[in-house]
Amino acid sequence: MMTETLQIRQIDDANKFQFISLLLIGDESEKMIGRYVDRGTLYAGYIGETAVAVCLTTDEGAGVVEVKNLAVRHEFRRRGIGRRMLAYIESINSGMTIQLGTGETPSTLRFYESCGYVYSHRIHDFFSDNYPAPIIEEGITLTDMIYLAKKAGHQSAD
């Protein structure tokens, strides 16, 4: 398969909400997105002039950058776009620890682990405490937020 050219651009604060449909793929609660979007930096991945992916990061201090939202349009998945978005975030934050939180969905955990992220910690009952309705992915009702981390600029040990 031919690798599509993915251009990644930082989005101005004033334009972040133009990407709400993509952000809602990564986090289905507009209220939750509102809790981090203003303090985050948004990057959009384009193929041609079409925005196909987003990644929103926050500076958590102490050398930690958190990926709050990573999303790829459904029809563009399984093409390495999410992996390229993460690699870009790592490249511009070399030497920093990149952390991210996700539900206990096996395919999502496998994806991040294949990118070199390792288990860090969990926040018990995060989804049930912060979302009005249950979130079900791959038949699993999400309860805990699983955090994974990676030192940017370091290869995984495989």
Q: What are the residue ranges of the model-derived segments?
A:
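Helix-loop element at the rim of GNAT/NAT acetyltransferase active sites that forms part
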Residues: 10-17, 22-34
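Conserved acetyl-CoA pyrophosphate-binding loop and the N-cap/start of the following alpha-helix
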Residues: 76, 80-88
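Conserved active-site tyrosine of GNAT-family acetyltransferases
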Residues: 111-113, 117
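Conserved N-terminal entry element of GNAT/NAT acetyltransferase domains
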Residues: 1-14, 146, 154-158
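A short, internal acetyl-CoA/4′-phosphopantetheine-binding micro-motif in the GNAT/acyltransferase core
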Residues: 70-77, 103
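Conserved GNAT acetyl-CoA-binding A-motif
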Residues: 92-104
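Conserved catalytic-core motifs of GNAT/GCN5-like acyltransferases
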Residues: 99-101, 118-141, 145
